[in-house]
Each structure stands twice: as C-alpha cells, then as structure tokens.
C-alpha cells in the first residue's frame, strides 16, 4: 500500500487526481435569517460573505472546543451549502436544530440534511482545470472568474451541478457536486477526459498525506475534544468583531488563552526515512526519571513522497514558541530526536492552490 500512496501523491502534485468525497456531510441552511444563524453557530463571520464565495467554517461547542469543520459556500443571499466531516454530519445537524428550536426560535431558517443527495467528485492537481473545462456547459472556470474558495451553479454534461473551487490537497482543485443518481456517470466522464492528462484515482490514505503536507487539520485527529481553534492553528478563523457565537464566552477564559496550551506544530526527525508513530509522546529530557513530563504527542505521521522524507504533526505545550527546538520521542529500544517546525511543509505561500 505504501507504494500506491506514494504514486498517488505524486500524481496529484504533478498531474491530477480524482477522489470520491461523497461521504462528507452536507446541510442546506435556507431562509431570510440564514446568515444570522450561521453567524451565531460558527466562530467565523458570515454576514458579509458574498454570494458565490466560500469560507472554511469552524464549529465549537459551548466549552470553546472544536467540534467540527468544513467548507461553506453561499449559494444565494438566503442559502448556504454547509459541509461537515464525514462522521460529524448527524451531530452537527442535531446541534443546529437544538439551537434553532430552543435558543433562536425567532429566526426564519430551515435546515435540511443533503448528504445523500449529492455525489462529490474531487478533482485535484495542476491539470484539473484542463480536464474539467471541456465537460462543463458554457461555464468559465478560469482563475479570474472562479478563484480559489468560490462556488458556482451550472451543469456538467447536462447534469445540474454545484462546482466548488476548493482544495484539501494544496493543489488547484475542484469539488463537483451532482445529484447522487448521476454520480457514477459523471465520475466516469471525468475519468475518461483525464486519461490524456495522466489522471489518477486516489484514496483516503493519500488524502491524509496531502493535507498533512499543507498542515491542514482533521477533526478527531489533530483535535480530541479539548482543542480550541487557536490551539489548532485556526485562531485566524474566529470572528473577533462578532458580538456572540457558540463558545465565545468560553474562549475568553484565561485557561483557554494560556500560552502553555497544547498547540499544533510540525515535526521533523533527523533521519528523513524514520516515520514517527502516531500517538508517540514527546519529552524535553529523555534521561529524566520515569514518569517523564510529557510535553505533547504526535497526531499525524506519514512519509511524504513529494518532500522525499517523513513529516508529522503534533500537539505540543506552548508549541508555537518552541519552534526550532528539539524534543525527544522515547521508544522501547531508542530515543528519536525531533525538531519542531511550522506545520505547513509544502507551498506555504499557497501559490499552487491559487493558480
């Protein structure tokens, strides 16, 4: 499997890859007060998001800890297409309904699960636009008309479509949403169109590596129910000027603002071929008597074919201030030195996904 993952990763980085993202949760938030509702639910600001634009949405519980995330597209002034994590779809909808019915019954909003109504085909890589352009019906998908984090409605081979210009790989990317009944036909059409461009199907393991190279978190892997947006490196997403949102008061607590909290960092081993074990603990002094003081742990660890070496993400106490330091992973038969670095290993400026 390792050889397949490396092959698929390089294909996405160099040509194009196709991935079935249909399992992602989808919720339609509709009504005159849809933007107000989103503004109260998510940590982000939504009222000024333009129609046809997308935003990375981060949802917290009342305690201020990250509960779910996903890209949200504004389809119309009164309609949002919300994506959730695969496992979080039912919980997010339940949470939304709970707040709508008990806290804000005055809001004129309807919520509908559309997870099973849409098939989602992710087309990622530098050749993605060349493959997709001949298939969409009279739609300009150039970077000038459809920039990164945009959404447009149209048709693909006569089939109704919501096309998102988004990327979880760090490359130029599109997510083609079509009715589930047409999903296989459109997949096969995209697949055939991509043969001349080296299109390669890729799976979940490859997706995990690609997103880790970009430092993108996965809820439930980088988060464990005790992680705030800032801990996860997503403090930029929090709407600082918003009067209120779920979790706002908790995020203001001193305990949740401590500089010693576990924070997301990148991890590099001295030996580029050594892949850390996920869950491995990191300490400052491997010679300290047991029980050693744990400073953090590895959340994600992979070999990056793109970079030609191993990479890892971890949550470390005061991690951002420790960048450049060396910590240690005590193993049964050896001690592994690990350098703390920025969690974005690939294209930190975002040039490729904005192509």
Model-derived regions: residue spans:
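Acidic, proline/glycine-enriched N-terminal capping motif
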Residues: 1-57, 65
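Membrane-targeting and insertion segments and their boundary/processing signals
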Residues: 8-12, 63-66, 70, 102, ...
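Acidic active-site catalytic centers that drive phospho-/nucleotidyl reactions
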Residues: 20, 69, 175
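Well-ordered mid-protein domain cores that form the structural environment of catalytic cofactors
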Residues: 45-78, 83-99
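Conserved, structured C-terminal
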Residues: 76-355
């Amino acid at each position: 499997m390792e050889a397949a993952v490396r092959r698929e990763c390089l294909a996405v980085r160099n040509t194009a890859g196709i991935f079935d993202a249909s399992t992602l949760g989808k919720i339609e938030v509709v009504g005159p007060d849809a933007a107000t509702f989103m503004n109260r639910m998510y940590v982000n600001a939504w009222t000024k998001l333009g129609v046809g634009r997308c935003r990375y949405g981060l949802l917290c519980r009342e305690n201020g800890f990250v509960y779910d995330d996903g890209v949200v597209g504004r389809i119309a002034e009164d309609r949002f297409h919300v994506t959730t994590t695969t496992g979080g779809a039912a919980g997010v909808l339940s949470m939304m309904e709970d707040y709508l019915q008990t806290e804000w019954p005055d809001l004129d909003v309807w919520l509908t699960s559309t997870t099973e109504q849409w098939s989602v085909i992710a087309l990622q890589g530098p050749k993605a636009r060349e493959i997709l352009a001949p298939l969409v019906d009279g739609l300009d998908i150039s970077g000038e008309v459809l920039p990164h984090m945009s959404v447009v409605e149209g048709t693909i081979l006569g089939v109704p479509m919501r096309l998102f210009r988004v990327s979880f790989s760090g490359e130029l990317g599109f997510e083609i949403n079509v009715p589930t009944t047409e999903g296989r036909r459109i997949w096969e059409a995209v697949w055939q169109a991509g043969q001349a461009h080296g299109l390669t199907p890729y799976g979940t393991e490859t997706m995990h590596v690609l997103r880790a190279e970009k430092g993108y978190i996965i809820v439930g892997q980088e988060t464990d129910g005790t992680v705030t947006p800032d801990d996860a490196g997503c403090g930029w997403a929090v709407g600082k000027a918003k009067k209120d949102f779920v979790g706002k008061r908790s995020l203001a607590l001193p305990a949740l603002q401590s500089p010693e909290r576990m924070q997301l960092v990148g991890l590099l081993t001295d030996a580029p071929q050594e892949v850390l074990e996920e869950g491995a603990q990191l300490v400052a002094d491997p010679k300290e008597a047991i029980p050693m003081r744990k400073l953090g742990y590895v959340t994600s660890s992979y070999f990056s074919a793109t970079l030609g070496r191993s990479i890892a993400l971890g949550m470390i106490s005061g991690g951002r201030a420790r960048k450049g330091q060396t910590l240690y992973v005590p193993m049964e038969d050896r001690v592994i030195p690990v350098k703390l670095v920025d969690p974005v290993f690939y294209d930190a400026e975002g040039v490729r996904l904005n192509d």
